């Protein structure tokens, strides 16, 4: 199974314009993501998928590979869909979609996701990761997406709200979704053609489209958590973690 990792990156952001190029300890964030991903074993190729020449130049300056996509991609998934067509990947090639706002991604979780797909090929349509929330502040923070899953670790729902809700107790695990996905080229091309889902539009969560149309999402549980960058304030958190690491 050939495995290609793609990092969709766009310059425009309502909360944090230019986020992929924001410097963290002297390097643009996209470089941290790329270099950490490159430590994962079993990957054939890594590319940044972008429509912005500033991001392209930054990635190429540190030796990274870039796929230039069009400016009209409505979402990261649409950008991934266009990139895999440009790259000419085979239908059964595995594609890892790693968000460009995860400069502290542990390569072990990438390997974990690939392993799940290899061991359980054909049992689900896409796979992702979750981690038990240990920080109380994340429980009611809509920037930290929660996930619930069945006994076979197939996703039941993703939400920006705290789920599940304990009517009589607060002593139970809540899982946060980690924004990394795995799927075949064939599935992502099917997914990208689906109309937007009602729940997807309400929550602004793309993965809900798959559930709304009856596709299975496997949720593997990670032992590692790491901060994502949603706002400029998150940069300081990442810098502190990198100093400790």
From Swiss-Prot:
Catalytic activity: 8-amino-3,8-dideoxy-alpha-D-manno-octulosonate + CTP = CMP-8-amino-3,8-dideoxy-alpha-D-manno-oct-2-ulosonate + diphosphate
One term under GO cellular component: cytosol
Keyword Cytoplasm in annotation: yes
Swiss-Prot/TrEMBL keywords: Cytoplasm, Lipopolysaccharide biosynthesis, Nucleotidyltransferase, Transferase
InterPro entries, sorted: Cytidylyl_trans, KdsB, Nucleotide-diphossugar_trans
GO MF term list: 3-deoxy-manno-octulosonate cytidylyltransferase activity
Annotated metabolic or biological route of this protein: Bacterial outer membrane biogenesis; lipopolysaccharide biosynthesis
Name of the protein this chain belongs to: 8-amino-3,8-dideoxy-manno-octulosonate cytidylyltransferase
Organism: Shewanella pealeana (strain ATCC 700345 / ANG-SQ1)
């Amino acid at each position: 199974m050939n495995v290609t990792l793609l990092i969709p990156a766009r310059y425009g952001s309502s909360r944090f314009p230019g986020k992929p190029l924001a410097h963290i300890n002297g390097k643009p964030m996209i470089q941290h993501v790329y270099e950490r991903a490159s430590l994962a074993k079993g990957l054939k190729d890594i590319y940044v998928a972008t429509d912005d020449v500033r991001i392209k130049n930054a990635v190429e300056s540190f030796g990274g590979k870039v796929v230039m996509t069009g400016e009209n991609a409505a979402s990261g998934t649409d950008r991934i869909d266009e990139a895999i067509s440009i790259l000419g990947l085979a239908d059964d090639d595995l594609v890892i979609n790693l968000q460009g706002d995860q400069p502290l991604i542990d390569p072990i979780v990438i390997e974990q996701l690939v392993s799940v797909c290899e061991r359980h090929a054909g049992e689900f349509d896409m796979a992702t990761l979750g981690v038990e929330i240990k920080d109380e502040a994340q429980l009611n923070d809509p920037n930290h997406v929660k996930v619930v899953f069945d006994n076979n670790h197939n996703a039941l729902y993703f939400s920006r709200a705290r789920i599940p809700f304990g009517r009589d107790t607060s002593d139970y695990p809540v899982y946060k979704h980690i924004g990394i996905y795995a799927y075949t080229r064939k599935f992502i091309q099917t997914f990208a053609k689906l109309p937007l889902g009602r729940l997807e539009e309400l929550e602004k969560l793309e993965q809900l489209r798959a559930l709304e149309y009856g596709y299975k999402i496997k949720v593997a549980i990670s032992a590692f958590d790491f901060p994502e960058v949603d706002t400029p304030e998150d940069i300081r958190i990442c810098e502190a973690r990198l100093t400790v690491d």
